[in-house]
Structure formats: structure tokens, C-alpha cells
Amino acid sequence: MFLCLYTGIRIGELCALQWKNISLSENAIKIEHTMQRLQSEDTKALQKTRIIVTEPKSYAALRTIPLPEFVIDVIKPFASSPNTYVLSGKCKKIVEPRIMQNRFKAYLAEGKIEEANFHSLRHTFATRCIEAGFDVKTLSEILGHSSVKITLDKYVHSSMKLKRSNMEKLKPASV
């Protein structure tokens, strides 16, 4: 969850992330795959769904995201062998998106925080980046969007503080 809050990556991208996708020396994370649960095509199969790892849905979603030093400091102690999933833990088993979403909801309930879905971390990241002064093109590329319109329409939410700050930029006309 920490990585999502500071990178804006999607839940499927987080679950598909392996340690070989994180360069601790270059302070970067490379998004090359996503994980999702799909309905089985065989209606008689014992398993009604299956988990797959594929390339992201668009070319723009294949990206390298620079990581701030403090993020590297937090994740470095957990680094493991290159082909190990970042979320695999001691059991070396994958953590798929549905499990991650359930954990997120449990953490919210435990903290008595109003219900939200995991994707809200991505929205929070985008809004915080705009508040911090990121330009929209850079943010759009970090989020893996094919156009800045997607970023502006769906992910950037202005706050009253930001609105006030922008309004303070206006100066009285000189006469």
C-alpha cells in the first residue's frame, strides 16, 4: 500500500511486481506486468476463476517511475531475490488483487476509517502530486496514462487549499 501511495501504481501492477522490477541503485521501479483474476473459460472447471499475469493494457502503462530516496529506504530491508514477487512475503506465494483489496478494507475498518477502495490510493497520489506542483504531463506519464486528459478528468481533484493558493496569485489591477 505504501508503494501505491507514493507511486500511483495500480493494484494489479503492485501484485505483479517482482524485485527485479525495482532498481535500488537507480531509485526506480519498472512497470512491465499486471495481475488480474479472470473468469475461467471452461464452465465445468473446478476453479471458476484464474489469476493471470500479463503486460499492461496499453503501451503507456509500460513505464519506469523514479522513486524518492525515502521510499527506497523503506523498501530496501524487504528486498529479496529478483524473481520473487514483492508482495509474496515469507511464504513465497503471490498476493493477488482480491486479497490485497480485502486486506486494505480490513486495515480501514481496523483504523475506523471510512470505507474506500484500493484505487483511492492512486487518486490520492495524483491529487497530492498536483498539490505539490507536479506538471500534468509528468504525472500522466508516472500514472501510465495515454493522455493528460485521462489524468485531469479522472484523477486530479483540487482541494480548497489549492484553490485558495491559486486565487491568491491574482493581484489587483494597477490603475
Listing of model-derived features with the role each one plays in the protein:
Residues 1-12, 28-29, 127-128:
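Short pre-functional
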Residues 7, 65, 80-94, 101-141, ...:
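Short, basic (Lys/Arg/His-rich) helix/loop patches that form interaction surfaces
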Residues 21-28, 134-154:
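Short, polar N-cap/turn motifs at the start of nucleic acid-interacting alpha helices
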Residues 16-77:
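Conserved tyrosine-mediated DNA breakage-rejoining catalytic core shared by Y-recombinases
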Residues 41-46, 132, 153, 157-175:
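DNA/chromatin major-groove-contacting recognition/catalytic segments
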Residues 1-5, 118, 152:
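Short, well-structured alpha-helical segments
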